[in-house]
Amino acid sequence: EKFKLLKEIGYDGVELNSPGGVDKKEALAASRETGLPIHGIVDSIHWVTRLSSPDANTRRKGLDGLRTAIRDAHLVKGSAVLLVPGAVRDAENENHQQVWDRSIEQIHWALPLAAKLGIHVLIENVWNGFLYDPKGDNNQTADLLAKYLDEIDSPWVGSYFDIGNHQRFGKPAEWIRTLGKRIVKLDVKGWGKSNGFCKIGDGDVDWPDVRRALAEIGFTGWSTAEVGGGNRDRMKDVHDRMDKHLLGKA
């Protein structure tokens, strides 16, 4: 019923969580019945069972979770897994360099499976203290994220760029221009100094410049509204806000 509702409203696809979440075979059946694709999977354990954890057993479990998400993405005919690669927690045991090194090592372990199944592993920019300065100003750049992706050096790894997440720390349109073809998918939400995370179109994001930047890099991938769900009216509002602010439709 949820797939049917989203299809009727005008959505082009959905994402699921893994490990866990809804039964993937049932979801695939619903996708086929309604014609609404499942375009990807979100790794559901990456915040707690981090690939950057100082504990080797936790990293192993995180890698197992990523591999499960990759398999589930393939099962539901998706194209990618969204991954938060780690989090900077303390200066001694999980600092920026350690998060960098450990996460890249674990991602490399997952890449043979990703390549075999044709599934991208896409890094989301989040408030994890990684690849930006959480105490810095609002003119930070995407240079570190670009460098991180380039060091992984795989056609199966790219950016799942979240437009709203780094409005506080930089200009999303400039991040888009810097990342360029590294961006494979987008997460869409609003953020503003006065209202924090908010509805798409509210807040401080310069949506016209975001649209210009996406056109400049030739972006044609999936864009996901990373916002709270709800009833038909709520989901119609989210859809219409995506159309207006991301696509520039009247």
Task: Label each PLM-derived region with a short phrase.
Residues 1-7, 77-79, 142-250:
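Histidine-acidic metal/acid-base catalytic patches
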Residues 14, 39, 81-82, 121, ...:
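Hydrophobic residues within beta-strands of alpha/beta enzymes
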Residues 17-19, 43-46, 86-88, 119, ...:
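Active-site beta-loop-alpha junctions enriched in small/polar residues
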Residues 32-33, 52-161, 166-168:
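Active-site acidic/histidine proton-transfer and metal-coordination neighborhood
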